[in-house]
Amino acid sequence: MDDIYRKAMKAQVGELAEEMDELYQLVSTGQPVSRVIYRAVERNLQLLTEACIGIAKHSLKGMAKEVPSDARQAFAKLRQLGLDHSGADWNRIIGMRNALVHAYLNLDAERVLDVVRQRRYQVLLDFAAQRLNDAA
């Protein structure tokens, strides 16, 4: 993985981690969540997923492996190579990302908020940290 990309993504993922922790605090109070906070949750989940997709593809590229255009295939290839130990359900994660981008009017807001309330986004942060700190 290119050092410039790695450095930029570490900074980006670090910012997203801080923002997700702030959002966790805001949505876990038991109080109603404002539309602005909810939109921030949606956007940050989208950005974090996009970051992981980019990291997966750049990891493969850095190893001179063929990079699938489909994100699910990129994660599957990393798993086949023994380079994704996150346990993440990438099909569900990418499905949610697609819904956030393309079907946002039909989303169940409580399901989206539960991802944050239950800190299920942590698997994305863990994957990113593992891949960005790896030598490849």
Stretches found by the model and what they are:
Residues M1-A136:
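Solvent-exposed interaction patches of small proteins and small membrane subunits
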